[in-house]
Amino acid sequence: MAEEVITPVYCTGVSAQVQKLRAKELGLGRHENAIKYLGQDYEQLRAHCLQSGSLFRDEAFPPVPQSLGFKELGPNSSKTYGVKWKRPTELFSNPQFIVDGATRTDICQGALGDCWLLAAIASLTLNDTLLHRVVPHGQSFQNGYAGIFHFQLWQFGEWVDVVVDDLLPTKDGKLVFVHSAQGNEFWSALLEKAYAKVNGSYEALSGGSTSEGFEDFTGGVTEWYELRKAPSDLYSIILKALERGSLLGCSIDISSVLDMEAVTFKKLVKGHAYSVTGAKQVNYQGQMVNLIRMRNPWGEVEWTGAWSDGSSEWNGVDPYQRDQLRVRMEDGEFWMSFRDFLREFTRLEICNLTPDALKSQRVRNWNTTLYEGTWRRGSTAGGCRNYPATFWVNPQFKIRLEETDDPEDDYGGRESGCSFVLALMQKHRRRERRFGRDMETIGFAVYEVPPELVGQPVHLKRDFFLANASRARSEQFINLREVSTRFRLPPGEYVVVPSTFEPNKEGDFVLRFFSEKKAGTQELDDQVQAILPDEQVLSEEEIDENFKALFRQLAGEDMEISVRELRTILNRIISKHKDLRTKGFSLESCRSMVNLMDRDGNGKLGLVEFNILWNRIRNYLSIFRKFDLDKSGSMSAYEMRMAIESAGFKLNKKLFELIITRYSEPDLAVDFDNFVCCLVRLETMFRFFKTLDTDLDGVVTFDLFKWLQLTMFA
């Protein structure tokens, strides 16, 4: 069959953002209505290829060196020399997508350090429901084959349907990366390609944690527990996790490469990924014993210690309960006591699944909430608590805890409280590796809302954080894709502040909140408003004679001040203030001020108009000096935020981002002339809006002429 190039259609710009928000409100991005990645529709593309008799070739992830990588696997790397992209039909006469179901033997690592991803894929094979959410049914190299396949992945809060062609990297007729033990089975290699596509290249997959893959295949959130420092109620946590259908895995750390696959005295394998499949309390000789059931997915090597298959401990258990627990010999699954589990294993991972991943009606679901946010230098990237001058500008999210955990969940005798998990994930960092950007160091802190602010959607300011310690926080700030921590706090309102470790580190993030009981959440942001003094417009007769004399001297014969004259006047004035760091008012800045203050539309300022501008500038100068805290002659972007609020303006995060982008220097300093221009524009625009908002509903309607008049001359 001939090959035909299919070009994807991309949505860009503001319209794409609006479309995305609307579509999300309608349910787009949920698993049952996954987003078509890069706008590629699998069914349409496949039908087109079948109709035209061509095999699909994906120009969004083409078979070229750049798709392999950028450094170790870059275009000129020795590791990629001789790589040829071939279809399975060119390698085998009878290639298969899946043979006799997906199993762990379908996944063998190739020349890529993505064992973390392959371990996650292997774990998927233990759960058919989850597997076929990622690997949709009905794909093959026989019926309706068109060289096109698709997979569904969770990406930062949304499910995406990813289309790939089946051109795979080969050397000497063999797959370079993941392959099956049988050789002719290709679902795992094609899934790896789909994952490489969303991350920009195969090389971007090098290095990671299994939990990252787990989350992208389930949409869940992972908790980590070091078993040497296990919380007293860990067994209760495991019971509840299993009850909710969570995926649990554990392992024994290795101290060197030589320990890999080493078998302990009691037949546990180091460096291996074990699944936790059950937990049960049994009555043993009159005492309740906590047991945990394990599965070794890699083989039949089983634990031989207490409570293992055929051990004497089972003789002390009621036969009916023993039969219920289905103790069998040599099936890769075994029981052990929870005490031995803590002693023998090193690490436990719990991947909590979202409600849409759980089809069973028997499991108890988490309540989940997801927020997307950004850190932008100068406006919302304040760094951690170590930087008190800027920490407060970070995005803030409120949690309202109302219902305490069920009494039967209070294993270990702790005081009642509300359990929840917070997970902070940074977005798109793998994809940005080719540009030299790697994971930022991230974390979060949790603060209790003071009584006087309960129920108010107020973005907490600097003074609050200077006076109050955090109530809880992430266990560490670390350069991983996600940081997650389980908390248990009394009912009340709390504010979560996610941040990078250092200020001015930019990035996008997702903050997820998983609660045992229903809880209220909201993003905190200031409401846009201005508290402006009544504008005193004096008549010419009321203006001070000294000011009139000054004006006549400055304005010249026409008794009006032009843009150039205003620039000369203002720069002469500020040159006398040696404490101000400024390059002087630009012609464009002065034109802006004239356009905004010019009431009769002649492009010049008369006596009254200049008097209003003059008084404003004097007021702005006093504010500028007040908030130039280090007396540097300029304000930082963060000082400017406080100064703007002092001038009577409350703005939200997005507006501050725009202002800092527009009015700050590359080093985020704001000089006096830019500060004045910003405030003049803000005040005039607020007053303009207030004049048009006659019914005070916060909405005005423009015709095209008014809109152009406002935007072209503002």
Curated annotation (Swiss-Prot):
Region annotation Domain III: where it falls in the sequence: 355-526
Manner of cofactor binding, per the entry note: Binds 4 Ca(2+) ions.
Keyword Hydrolase: yes
Cell location: Cytoplasm; Cell membrane
Residues where Ca(2+) 3 binds: 598, 600, 602, 604, 609
Residues with the Phosphothreonine modification: 354
Regulation: Activated by micromolar concentrations of calcium and inhibited by calpastatin.
Source taxon at top rank: Eukaryota
Binding-site list for Ca(2+) 4: 628, 630, 632, 634, 639
Cofactor(s) of this protein: Ca(2+)
Reactions performed catalytically: Broad endopeptidase specificity
Enzyme Commission no: 3.4.22.52
A Pfam family assignment: Peptidase_C2
List of residues binding Ca(2+) 1: 109, 114
Stretches assigned to the Calpain catalytic domain: 55-354
GO molecular function terms listed in the Swiss-Prot or TrEMBL record: calcium ion binding; calcium-dependent cysteine-type endopeptidase activity
InterPro entries documented for this protein: C2_III, Calpain_cysteine_protease, Calpain_domain_III, Calpain_III, Calpain_III_sf, EF-hand-dom_pair, EF_Hand_1_Ca_BS, EF_hand_dom
Positions contributing to Ca(2+) 2 binding: 318, 323
Chain residue ranges for the region called Linker: 527-542
SUPFAM superfamilies tied to this protein: Calpain large subunit, middle domain (domain III), Cysteine proteinases, EF-hand
Site (described: Cleavage): 15-16, 27-28
Assembly information from the UniProt record: Forms a heterodimer with a small (regulatory) subunit CAPNS1.
Cross-referenced PANTHER family: CALPAIN, CALPAIN-1 CATALYTIC SUBUNIT
Family: Belongs to the peptidase C2 family.
Protein name: Calpain-1 catalytic subunit
